[in-house]
Amino acid sequence: MICYNQQSSEPPTTKTCSEGQCYKKTWSDHRGTIIERGCACPNVKPGVKISCCSSDK
């Protein structure tokens, strides 16, 4: 499966993942809204929104 692999303001790239899921995490701090994308569907801390999917990108 192909997932986006991205940290906040960096341009999105793609990565082939064996986990079978992709995630997108968003949260806010003193820098503003932070977005992180990657493979799998990790557990997150309270206050962090996460969306997981099982289709490419």
From Swiss-Prot:
Superkingdom of origin organism = Eukaryota
Subcellular location as annotated = Secreted
Q: Which GO terms describe its molecular function?
A: acetylcholine receptor inhibitor activity; ion channel regulator activity; toxin activity
Q: Per UniProt, which keywords does this protein have?
A: Acetylcholine receptor inhibiting toxin, Disulfide bond, Ion channel impairing toxin, Neurotoxin, Postsynaptic neurotoxin, Secreted, Toxin
Gene Ontology annotations for the cellular component aspect, listed alphabetically: extracellular region
Glycoprotein is among the record's keywords: no
Do you know which InterPro entries this protein is assigned to?
Snake_3FTx, Snake_toxin-like_sf, Snake_toxin_con_site, Toxin_cobra-type
Q: Can the keyword Cell wall biogenesis/degradation be found in this entry's annotation? A: no
Please list the disulfide bridges: 3-22, 17-39, 41-52
- Functional description taken from the UniProt entry: Produces peripheral paralysis by blocking neuromuscular transmission at the postsynaptic site. Binds to and inhibits the endogenous nicotinic acetylcholine receptors (nAChR). This neurotoxin is lethal to mice by intraperitoneal or intravenous injection.
Q: Which family does it belong to?
A: Belongs to the three-finger toxin family. Short-chain subfamily. Type I alpha-neurotoxin sub-subfamily.
Q: What is this protein called?
A: Three-finger toxin Tschuditoxin-I
Q: Which species is the source of this protein? A: Micrurus tschudii
Taxonomic lineage is: Eukaryota, Metazoa, Chordata, Craniata, Vertebrata
